[in-house]
Regions:
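A structural boundary/capping signal
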Residues: 1-237
Length: 237
């Protein structure tokens, strides 16, 4: 009797990746989203490309550098040397969400650029997190004693954002904003929206971005694939 090896489907693979929150592989899971569009993509090759970038970055950081020095090295490497940037001219291109393409073209949207930036930051031992800010995904570095507080960065541009700039970005998303009512942003309100996003939340936002793009394009085949992933990722929703 002949036995044929049954290879797991891309959805089976995705299901395995997102089973547990205890050890959720953000980068690998984000890369795997591209399998719907690029079924022959070699995920390990993409992960290896990121590892090479991490190794190159580490060689640029001096021993005993503090967190802010590491952050400067990271941003210089990512935005200036590697020239990762936001895809301003084609923001709604779904390929901006596929990390194999983002790595190749050095262009993406805030959340896809953030996933790569976070991986590089973590390779330096930095306490970096994604921030699911309304309307625009951000990243932040948590500082520890003696450098307390955090630095919030727009991964689309590489800019560090002040409290006032963050408040200005938040105001349009608050109740009453469309009525033109003046808004005052409390520290507690801002802190709430600057909470660290869990990996599962980041992947969900990436999928919802794709869902919205394909919905507008009335691409039912791709919509179905995105919905299947969301159902696996968020079974209780």
């Amino acid at each position: 009797m002949d036995y044929k090896l049954q290879l797991p489907s891309v959805l089976d693979y995705f299901t395995t990746l997102v089973q547990s929150d205890d050890d959720f592989p953000l980068l690998e899971t984000a890369v795997s989203l591209a399998q719907d569009e690029f079924p022959k993509m070699d995920i390990q090759q993409v992960l290896d490309e990121v590892d090479v970038l991490c190794a190159r970055l580490k060689r640029r950081v001096l021993p005993h550098s503090d967190a802010l020095d590491k952050l400067r090295a990271l941003n210089t490497f990512f935005f200036e040397d590697m020239r990762f940037a936001g895809n301003v001219n084609h923001y709604d291109d779904p390929h901006n969400s596929y990390l194999n393409v983002v790595l190749s073209k050095r262009l993406g949207i805030p959340i896809s650029l953030a996933v790569l930036w976070l991986e590089l930051g973590q390779s330096l031992g930095l306490k970096v997190h994604g921030v699911s800010f309304p309307g625009h995904f951000l990243v932040k570095l948590d500082l520890v004693y003696p450098q307390e507080g955090h630095v919030v960065i727009d991964p689309f541009t590489g800019e560090s954002l002040s409290r006032d700039e963050l408040a200005d970005r938040l105001i349009p998303w608050l109740p009453g904003a469309k009525l033109g009512k003046p808004q005052a942003i409390s520290d507690d309100a801002l802190a709430f929206h600057l909470q660290a996003a869990e990996p599962r939340q980041i992947i969900a936002r990436m999928l919802r971005n794709l869902h919205e793009i394909y919905r507008r394009q009335d691409d039912q085949e791709r919509l179905a694939k995105v919905r299947a992933r969301l159902a696996v990722l968020l079974p209780d929703n």
